[in-house]
Amino acid sequence: MTSLFQAGEAEALLQAAIDGGLPDERGRFGPFGGRYVPETLVPAFERLEAGVKEHLHEPGFQAEFQRELREWVGRPTALTYAGRLSERWGADVWLKREDLAHTGAHKINNAIGQALLAKRLGVERVIAETGAGQHGVASAAACARVGLPCTVYMGAVDMERQAPNVDRMRRLGAECVAVESGDQTLRAAIDEALRTWVTDPHGIYYLLGSAVGAHPYPYLVRELQSVIGEESRQQMLDQAGALPDAAFACVGGGSTAIGLFYPLLAVDIELIGVEAGGTGTGLGQNAATLATGTPGVLQGSYTIILQDDDGQVQETHSISAGLDYSGVGPEHAMLQATGRV
């Protein structure tokens, strides 16, 4: 992937990321990102971008967001020393316990932030997509918190293997819609949510769950999830007395990983993303997008995707419902291309 850049370009791009200059005004992370959407969705994305610029870093919004993270989500989440794993692997292993956040995963950080934004934008209802179900549960909980109706789209295959989360969403007041088109997993759920958003772009807020899709979503999700890396850095200094040699995170769409990695970009730490290996390296056998994919456009963003020689997006395979996505966030594509991750 480094062949995308001429001498010095990768270093300059990475420095821009460290300095907070990415995405640029076009929503791009170097060659990746951007906004490739139907004309009917352009006003909705422009309205969302304007709302993000107006509210996201406004002191009042940030005060409300930080209060919700502290009093409702339960942050900071713990950093736990894994003694037996450390003994087995011959290295000190620390676990950032996002499982201890309200609803059981990191997804709630992004969900409550976007729900607060949706409330400020004056929409009538919220829609969301989900793969493993965690983002659906988080969206349902966040919408209940701010008093907005919520509809969650979920691939039929994922609904079968994640039935307990479907039940949790419904108990939290959300409507769950099974998507039976396409591969019936996360990609199909995102497609269906986008189709619904087109029908009423001013009355509906689309609460996207990962750092994927068209600008400004990759930026918005990164900003809301960066609390993971910010807390981890301080907790390592407080508890271990030093920063780690390496930080690992799983990568599907990439919201967990970008939340951990982004605050650590400027630090001399090896950043390692782990993808779903599935049953092999061939197309359709895995969800290892960065390891086996090629550049292309998927769901509004130019990024790395799993596609055949004709540019047809391929189905994925993984026992993990949260990692079986045919693409990856554009910032991850950039970070891999520069060699930082």
Q: Where are the regions that the model predicts?
A:
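Active-site-proximal loop->helix
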Residues: R125-I127, H135-A193, G282-G293
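Positively charged, low-complexity intrinsically disordered leader regions
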Residues: F5-G33, E39-T40, E46-V123
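A short, small-residue-rich loop immediately preceding and capping a beta-strand
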Residues: H102, N110, A118-G155, A242-T256, ...
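Active-site/ligand-binding loops adjacent to catalytic centers
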Residues: I190-P216, L220, G273-V341
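Gly-rich Lys/Arg/Thr-decorated short loops/hinges at beta-loop-alpha junctions or inter-strand turns
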Residues: F61-E68, W89-L100, A118, R171, ...
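Glycine-rich ThDP/TPP pyrophosphate-binding loop and its adjacent helix/strand module
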Residues: T185-T196, G203, L208-D268
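Short beta-strand segments
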Residues: K96, Y153-M154, E180, L207-A211, ...
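Buried hydrophobic positions in well-ordered alpha/beta secondary-structure cores of metabolic enzymes
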Residues: G34, A78, L95, K107, ...
